[in-house]
């Protein structure tokens, strides 16, 4: 959890926002996935948000669903994902690493065992996409027991009671959703969300990072200008992977260029 605090303090001193890319572990193969993560970090990613392949990712649009299918086709298992996470942490001791999960994957070997494994491989946070705050007690208790930040989604229509609960129970960062629906760069984020950012700050919530539909530098600039601590981009990044499956070197160079541009937009 401390890695997020250190990151946000450092960026605040530099008057920068955070840029956080999302990719699915093992897409399109374990070997290429690790090269992709190296590239994201080299291009300026401030933290990582990583998905573990799941057969029914309800919160995700077709782009990220296809990433899950590619990882499955490559034979990626949850066990392999934890091996990859351990390798990433060993190579990058300071970068915050977050997981975006679904409850069935957390339940499969027991909630406590899951968070213990996360702690062992150096994961900082876990967002369980299909568990709302009101149903999260067992998850967040296990997370905190193992020093893992429980992350909660703040929807654009959140009422005051929900904002207070998110502020009370969330750690690390708050996932501020730009719009209703599933992930996807083809549906643009609804910007800005100044009123929600102001309320979250008033209630001392973990710093808000805005995601869903963030696909160009202008949106990152608007997000940071609204007072959010930064932006998360997934589908736009996964689309670059999808477009270049047969050209792995082109894939990496396009990812580097995209992430560099998005990170630069956090500085304006």
Curated annotation (Swiss-Prot):
PROSITE patterns reported for this sequence: TRP_SYNTHASE_ALPHA
InterPro entries: Aldolase_TIM, RibuloseP-bd_barrel, Trp_synthase_alpha_AS, Trp_synthase_suA
Keywords attached to this entry: Amino-acid biosynthesis, Aromatic amino acid biosynthesis, Lyase, Tryptophan biosynthesis
Top-level enzyme category: lyase
Keyword Amino-acid biosynthesis included in the entry's annotation: yes
Functional note: The alpha subunit is responsible for the aldol cleavage of indoleglycerol phosphate to indole and glyceraldehyde 3-phosphate.
Protein name: Tryptophan synthase alpha chain
Record organism: Pectobacterium atrosepticum (strain SCRI 1043 / ATCC BAA-672)
Lineage: Bacteria, Pseudomonadati, Pseudomonadota, Gammaproteobacteria, Enterobacterales
